[in-house]
């Protein structure tokens, strides 16, 4: 059968779903089970099922496909053309499982706090609840330099529901107690620059997620890797060291109504932009332009393998390149949540070297 390209809005959904770890993937070896990494034969792209050998639409979610349908396939796409999308999806899926371990254990610790302990911290200051992230999930793929993004995913039932439930309950506990956590913060205007993945996706080895400054990476609000030097293999420049609000702004503050998460897993800054409603979900906040960079190689590949008429029909004037450039310009608006741009009334922070904790703002500073 003849196939067509997915539409532009479906590709946008695909990118967004990749950074939520929610892309459905089919492989001949594993079927629709993505817990074991395998080369995809099909992916779900905005409600359409697309062939990953040509990016043609071969079906929809209304019909559960059990094999790759026979179709007129140009077989010009290679895994390296879309591996960035696959990488973002799988790393985020690993990240969410790690964050579930973290928030569930912090929630359990907070549940054990007695009214007497809470009153003592309110009166005298100090830490009320403390958690060493490095002991939370010893089996996490992020614990070892030898781990790979292709490592098997832990099977978790209703992952998103559990994350939302624990995260919401933890927020309510913190807010109702007027406490300050050191793993939450608000987006200070446009200071956050999304995410730049360290290393190309096809490099299967993660660089170590924590080093001699492990507390800084795991217990602090890290939000960016700044550009510094150009790497010809990556095509753009990177600064290898992390950037923190304290480093960028000097002393940086935090209040009990700030929102975001650490620890940072797999070099993916998990920063939550404040929604206009004040509500924050358990997903990494990643700038739209960073999301779009994940499909740059795919854009180039599709331009070479599809006729300009079909591309123009699916994506409008200018084809893939035109769609890519237009969406890049709109990305901060159409692909990211609205950000609150006010600084809260903040507690001052210095080097932020202490572990993940919840306590009194007068002492945490």
From Swiss-Prot:
Gene Ontology BP annotations: regulation of translation; symbiont-mediated suppression of host innate immune response; symbiont-mediated suppression of host PKR/eIFalpha signaling; symbiont-mediated suppression of host type I interferon-mediated signaling pathway; viral life cycle
Keywords: Capsid protein, Host cytoplasm, Host nucleus, Host-virus interaction, Inhibition of host innate immune response by virus, Inhibition of host interferon signaling pathway by virus, Inhibition of host PKR by virus, Interferon antiviral system evasion, Metal-binding, Outer capsid protein, RNA-binding, Transcription, Transcription regulation, Translation regulation, Viral immunoevasion, Virion, Zinc, Zinc-finger
SUPFAM superfamilies found in the cross-reference section: Outer capsid protein sigma 3
InterPro entries: Reo_capsid_sigma3, Reovirus_capsid_sigma-3_dom_sf
ZnF locations on chain (CCHC-type): 51-73
Molecular function (Gene Ontology), one example: structural molecule activity
Record's keyword annotation contains Transmembrane helix: no
Pfam families assigned to the protein according to its UniProt record, in alphabetical order: Reovirus_cap
Localization: Virion; Host cytoplasm; Host nucleus
Superkingdom in the source lineage: Viruses
Stretches of the chain forming a coiled coil according to its record: none
Modification(s) after translation: Cleaved during virus the endosomal proteolytic disassembly of the outer capsid.
GO CC annotation terms, alphabetical: host cell cytoplasm; host cell nucleus; viral outer capsid
Family assignment from sequence similarity: Belongs to the orthoreovirus sigma-3 protein family.
Function: Stimulates translation by blocking the activation of the dsRNA-dependent protein kinase EIF2AK2/PKR, thereby inhibiting the host interferon response. Sigma3 prevents the activation of EIF2AK2 by competing with the kinase for dsRNA-binding. The viral outer shell polypeptides, of which sigma-3 is one, impose structural constraints that prevent elongation of nascent transcripts by the RNA-dependent RNA polymerase lambda-3.
Quaternary structure, from the entry: Heterohexamer of three sigma-3 and three Mu-1 proteins. The RNA-binding form is probably a homodimer.
Record protein name field: Outer capsid protein sigma-3
Name of the gene: S4
């Amino acid at each position: 059968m003849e196939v067509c390209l997915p539409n532009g809005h479906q590709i946008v959904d695909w990118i967004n779903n990749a950074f939520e770890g929610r892309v459905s993937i089919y492989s001949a070896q594993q079927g629709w089970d993505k817990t074991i990494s395998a080369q995809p034969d099909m992916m779900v792209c905005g409600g359409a099922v697309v062939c990953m050998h040509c990016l043609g639409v071969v079906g929809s979610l209304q019909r559960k496909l059990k094999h790759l349908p026979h179709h007129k396939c140009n077989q010009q796409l290679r895994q390296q053309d879309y591996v960035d999308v696959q990488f973002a999806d799988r790393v985020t899926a690993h990240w969410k499982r790690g964050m579930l371990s973290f928030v569930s254990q912090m929630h359990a610790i907070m549940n054990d706090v007695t009214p007497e302990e809470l009153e003592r911290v309110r009166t005298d200051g100090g830490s009320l609840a403390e958690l060493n992230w490095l002991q939370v999930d010893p089996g996490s793929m992020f614990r070892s330099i030898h781990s790979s993004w292709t490592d098997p995913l832990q099977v978790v039932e209703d992952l998103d529901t559990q994350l939302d439930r624990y995260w919401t309950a933890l927020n309510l506990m913190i807010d109702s107690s007027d406490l300050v956590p050191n793993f939450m913060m608000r987006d200070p205007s446009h200071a956050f620059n999304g995410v730049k993945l360290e290393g190309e996706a096809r490099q299967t080895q993660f660089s170590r997620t924590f080093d001699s400054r492990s507390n800084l990476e795991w217990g602090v609000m890290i939000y960016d890797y700044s550009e510094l030097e150009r790497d010809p293999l990556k095509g753009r420049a990177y600064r290898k060291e992390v950037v923190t609000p304290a480093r960028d702004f000097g002393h940086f503050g935090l209040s009990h109504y700030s929102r975001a998460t650490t620890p940072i897993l797999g070099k993916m800054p998990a920063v939550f932009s404040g929604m206009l409603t004040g509500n924050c979900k358990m997903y990494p906040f990643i700038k739209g332009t960073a999301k779009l960079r994940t499909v740059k190689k795919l854009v180039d590949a599709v331009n070479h393998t599809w006729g300009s008429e079909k591309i123009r029909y699916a994506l409008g004037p200018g084809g893939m390149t035109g769609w890519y450039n237009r969406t890049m310009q709109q990305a901060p608006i159409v692909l990211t949540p609205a950000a609150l741009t006010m600084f809260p009334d903040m507690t001052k922070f210095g080097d932020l070297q202490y572990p993940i904790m919840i306590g009194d703002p007068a002492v945490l500073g």
